[in-house]
Amino acid sequence: MEKNLSSRDDDALHSLSASSSYDSVYDLLHYHERGNGLTINGKPSYSIEDAGDQITRDNVSWNGSNVFGKSANLTFKFLQSARSTPDGDTGFVKFNAAQVAQAKLALQSWADLANITFTEVTGNQSANVTFGNYTRDSSGRLDYGTQAYAYLPGSGSASGTTWYNYNVDNIRSPDKMEYGRQTLTHEIGHALGLNHPGDYNAGEGNPTYREDTRQFSIMSYWSEKNTGGDFKGHYAAGPMLDDIDAIQRLYGANMTTRTGDTVYGFNSNTDRDFYTATSSSKALIFSVWDAGGKHTFDFSGYSNNQRINLNEGSLSDVGGLKGNVSIAHGVTIENAIGGSGNDLLIGNNADNILRGGAGDDILYGGGGADRLYGGSGRDTFVYTAVSDSKVAAPDWILDFQTGVDKIDLSALNTGNNLHFVNQFSGSGGEILLNWDSSASVSNLYLNLDNNTSPEFQVKIVGQVSQTADFVV
């Protein structure tokens, strides 16, 4: 699904500054555009697909070398003893209960994305992916310098093994410290065939491309702040936007994941902790993979000003963080619920339901027959093209407050000739506002062509004033 406005010659329109509300919509739709030959600060920008290729550049999986999109039934094991790690580290400690529980959650987060199954084995049975702790380096000294490491799939004895430094607090308590959970997900990524996005290790080296940060990949070592994000010291628990493309390149997309109607955020029914907000203090950092159904972003419990974009591949600012929520390619999220701040909600080409909630919100439905609720506060409903609300399938604005809310048509007034009329004359640039008293609905029509047939219609519950309620 293409981003609304992306194929239009809208840069010139943006320079005209149609309105501040339109500018807000434009800025979010063009937030972190990537690929297409862009170079930022001397680094090439990679598309999601190119980044996925880069992260899996060794082209290895548990199906062998250069085998792509093939499912795998894998086993995993929590080691009970080990003389040393493949790197020679010693002082083995088996996983504690918190580590076991968090490792299983991390495994599930990968299985949700791709055609991978994980079965636990014990005893003398071999496993594809194993887990163990160490405490001392190869010289026998207590090791406080490393966090963890893992090995790619293969036929060697080290292949798929993952190792964790038990001297590190977040490793011992990944249930209480976010970086410990992120480390588990990161190392499992290696054991499945994912590399770091660049040719570096343990913080040494430089990123290869612009999007090599934790905003886009849990396999990255670089802060999200390098690409304009801000997680306020929090860390992702599950794979991020580019990781989804990477793991699906190797094993294929899991098309059985969340095929029903799913809610992300508050009132979540995902059964995944990183998709679930239980209070306004919960920091959500996630990228959505979803195989079907009708889906909702519910960020109603936050009082921060939020920017929510439902287009695939997009980034949203949620709960006081920046660029912390994204949507994978091929995923359609139909609905969004804002909080009590001044939120910006942007739909996609599906039939969206957008609810602004309290605050002075801006709603842009984009294509499709959308149902829009501004909520309390002074809300603005933005339209940028006649295709945003067609006569055959119009938008509905369902809680418009006359004299308070606004309908912003300024982006359609490119020739400064948009004007209200009592009936269409056959000239372009005409707006007709019709009140249907029997249904208590105002019908807004636009005719931009030189004929008497409107190309655009919005249905508004309640009576609307052409002098008080429009930005033209």
Swiss-Prot record:
The active site is at E187. Its EC number is 3.4.24.40. It comes from Dickeya chrysanthemi (Pectobacterium chrysanthemi). Hemolysin-type calcium-binding repeats lie at residues 337-354, 355-372. Ca(2+) 5 binds at G357, G359, D361, G374, D379. Ca(2+) 4 binds at N348, A350, N352, G365, G367, D370. Zn(2+) binds at H186, H190, Y221. It comes from the Bacteria. Ca(2+) 2 binds at G293, T332, E334. This is Serralysin A. Pfam families: HemolysinCabind (PF00353), Peptidase_M10 (PF00413), Peptidase_M10_C (PF08548).
